[in-house]
């Protein structure tokens, strides 16, 4: 795969796990949700990868702004979309999916929001397979699972009747 389209800008970190320093090289288009909804976060990414600012935007920050025509014109080989997205096209956008597929664009759905403990490793493994980055995906998933087990192990050692701590994660 030489040409990638992200159906949500906020999927950029997942792509970066696999692409690393080569992040913008294959990315031909993405939604503009990342920079509009998290300008400081996007600014950090664009400082590290200035080429991101040159990547075509195929919409703003909601699925209704996604332009099928712009996306198809970029000639991506694969469109990576978020399951139940909200910021980009999702599995419920049948017409958009049909147009992308009719143009010969493979469509892949990943999920880091609806069931992250179950779907994060699955999504990274799928991306690794699709993008030819299996080794990078396996390395991440191995580390991710080990860190998750470390947290779960500590929670199992809490004395009976002790409430588990509440945790909020933000990237």
Which residues fall in each region the model found?
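N-terminal ligand-binding lobe of clamshell/alpha-beta domains
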Residues: 1-171
């Amino acid at each position: 795969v030489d040409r990638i389209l992200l159906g949500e800008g906020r999927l950029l970190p997942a792509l970066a796990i696999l692409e690393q320093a080569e992040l913008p090289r294959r990315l031909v288009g993405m939604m503009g949700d990342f920079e509009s909804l998290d300008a400081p976060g996007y600014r950090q990414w664009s400082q590290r990868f200035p080429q991101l600012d040159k990547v075509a935007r195929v919409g703003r920050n909601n699925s209704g702004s996604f332009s099928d025509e712009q996306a198809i014109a970029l000639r991506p080989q694969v469109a990576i979309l978020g399951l139940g997205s909200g910021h980009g096209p999702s599995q419920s956008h049948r017409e958009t999916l049909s147009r992308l597929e009719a143009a010969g664009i493979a469509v892949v759905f990943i999920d880091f929001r609806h069931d992250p403990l179950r779907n994060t490793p699955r999504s990274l493994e799928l991306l690794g397979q699709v993008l030819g980055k299996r080794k990078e995906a396996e390395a991440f998933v191995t580390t991710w699972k080990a860190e998750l087990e470390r947290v779960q192990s500590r929670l199992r050692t809490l004395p009976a009747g002790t409430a588990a701590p509440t945790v909020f994660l933000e990237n």
